Structures are given as C-alpha cells and as structure tokens.
C-alpha cells in the first residue's frame, strides 16, 4: 500500500514541474506579465511626452506667439520701448 502512494506522489511532482517551473510555466507567465505592465506604463509616459512635444512643434510652426514667448522667457528679449525687469527669487 505504501509504494503506490509514493509512486503517485512522485508522478504528481514530475507532472507539476513543467506547470510551475518549465517553459511557459506560471513563473514565466508572471514574469512576462510584470514586464508587459512595466512596458505599458513606459509607453503611456512616452505618449504623453510626445503629445506635449507635438503641441509645442505645432505652436512654433503656426504662429509667432510661441516663438516670442520662448524668446522672452529663455533669452530675455524685449520689444522696442519695453523695459525688462527681473525679480530675484528668494531661497
């Protein structure tokens, strides 16, 4: 009576090995699912960044307002008869 139980236990272990640890097993599926989730988050972040850059490019192509704004903010340029005042930030 003891040998059939041992044989069945060994058989169950042998049959379960590919399910849990083999190629396409649960551990591999879990790892692939985790990587898929990370990649989707990265894709979402990059899509948002691309949308912002696309909007900025369209603004720069369509009119002078965006160019003027960047020139004022980044280069400190002013219009004729305009005074530029810079207020230092408190630390």
From Swiss-Prot:
Protein name, entry field: Cell division protein FtsB
Assigned protein family: Belongs to the FtsB family.
Residues forming coiled coils: 28-72
InterPro entries: Cell_div_FtsB, FtsL/DivIC
Topological domain spans for side Cytoplasmic: 1-3
HAMAP family: FtsB
GO biological process: FtsZ-dependent cytokinesis
Quaternary assembly: Part of a complex composed of FtsB, FtsL and FtsQ.
NCBIfam families (UniProt xref): PRK00888.1 (NF002058)
GO CC terms of this entry: cell division site; cell septum; plasma membrane
Main location: membrane
Residue ranges annotated as Periplasmic topological domain: 22-91
Membrane-topology annotation of the record: Single-pass type II membrane protein
Residue ranges of the TM segments: 4-21
Organism placement in taxonomy: Bacteria, Pseudomonadati, Pseudomonadota, Betaproteobacteria, Rhodocyclales
Keywords associated with the record: Cell cycle, Cell division, Cell inner membrane, Cell membrane, Coiled coil, Membrane, Transmembrane, Transmembrane helix
UniProt subcellular location: Cell inner membrane
Protein's job: Essential cell division protein. May link together the upstream cell division proteins, which are predominantly cytoplasmic, with the downstream cell division proteins, which are predominantly periplasmic.
Entry keyword annotation includes Hydrolase: no
């Amino acid at each position: 009576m003891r040998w059939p139980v041992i044989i069945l236990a060994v058989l169950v272990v042998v049959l379960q090995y590919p399910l849990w640890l083999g190629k396409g097993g649960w551990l591999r599926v879990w790892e692939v699912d985790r990587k898929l989730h990370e990649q989707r988050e990265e894709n979402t972040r990059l899509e948002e960044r691309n949308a912002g850059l696309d909007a900025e490019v369209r603004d720069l192509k369509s009119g002078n307002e965006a160019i003027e704004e960047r020139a004022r903010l980044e280069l400190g340029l002013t219009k004729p008869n305009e005074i530029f005042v810079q207020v230092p930030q408190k630390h």
